[in-house]
Amino acid sequence: RAFRHLRGTPDFLLFPHRLLTMLFLRLLPLILCFSGLVHAEHRVFTRKDGFLSMRDKLNVYFFRSDTHRLLVRDEGSVKTPRYGSLDKAMRKSPCVAGVNGGFFSADAEGTPLGLVVQDGKRLSPLATGSFAVSGVVYEGGRDGLTLIRSSVLRRMRRLPAMQAAIQGGPFLVENGSAVKGLNAQKSTYRTFIATDGGRRWCIGVSSSLTLKELAAWLAAPGALGNFRVETALNLDGGSSSAFWCHETGISYPAFKQVRNYLGVAPVERR
């Protein structure tokens, strides 16, 4: 219909219009991405320090808190899990992406080490006094999606209303800068959640890195494209790290059974 007024026009005169249309459609995803209109997407970032070094990789899923929400899916037990894997847990939920969740103990049940809230129900209490559970990411209440220090929640008389919550740590980035004093010796797979301080968020997993290396990477200007990391929290990693994305069909399972998962789902419109 757009070319109806050109009926009868020679093909060679129509060609520029068609070429421009095709070019626009090819560039549309990039235009939307850089304009911030894309609400959710999966991207892969790589870097290489030296000629003989391994290529480091980040699998990251970006989303907005005004269009998407966090869901927690708990296995109930690592011995007799309800789902058995991140992939199965996400597919049985309205999630478009997900990662493994918080730390858990080595007992038969895999008791969570820190706060866990699923569908508004608190499954595990807030933990205190540990570097590994220094932060909480939660969904719900007046502030919507929030990443906060555990010590701040601890000082509250009552915890805010939460639909979903996972406790983790340590913080990797605060106020846009890499946190100092992070471990620089142990390299392993890492899982994290980050925000730009506004409505833009991401979850991700990394190749084998130290906490210090991951923090420095996330805090570096342009490390995640036009997403500037204001705050980032480490979640359970190592053999627990897992990443799943419905859009791209990517599924990186954990090497062992984990206790819970953190998923991203579209906001339910009423």
Regions found by a protein language model. Give the residues of each.
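Short hydrophobic targeting helices and cationic amphipathic motifs
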Residues: 4-6, 12-13
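Short, Lys/Arg-enriched N-terminal segments with co-localized hydrophobic residues
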Residues: 11-21
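Sec-dependent signal peptide recognition
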Residues: 22-30
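Hydrophobic h-region of N-terminal signal peptides that target proteins for export
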Residues: 31-38
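Gly/Ser/Thr/Pro-rich low-complexity, intrinsically disordered segments
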Residues: 39-270
